[in-house]
Amino acid sequence: MNSQKPFLSEPIHRFLDDGVVIPALPLALTSSRQFDETRQRALLRYYMDAGSGGVAVGVHSTQFEIRDPEIGLFESVLSLAAEEMKAYEARTNRPLIKVAGVVGKSAQAVKEAELAAELGYDIALVSLSAFKDGTNDHMIEHL
């Protein structure tokens, strides 16, 4: 008998199997290109209230820039989004699939995945952009 913890909780697994829309979260910035926490929360609430099945954070349009040490927004953006999604779940009793983008070579990707797990994310969407010159074997080992 397999004693490992299931990869996804049963409600999240069932929800995902039913088929849901999970939009990628754009980064909300002020006109002076500073992180706009108020508008970021509003954007998250818009997606959730519109019926999305979850939100993917730190992917696509925000994937690389928020990780830049000079910008330093990766943890802040993931944390804010997780907090807003958990509040929505508590308020509506409707599960959301929380997806975190994970990038970089294995050490960075593992660190990002561990942070996402600590914040309550369900799934990591792994970018293989760091392996553009790598072999398939290197990418498979990374995953």
Task: Please report, for each region that a protein language model flagged, where it lies by residue.
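Active-site beta->alpha loop and helix N-cap motifs at the rims of alpha/beta catalytic domains
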Residues: 2-143
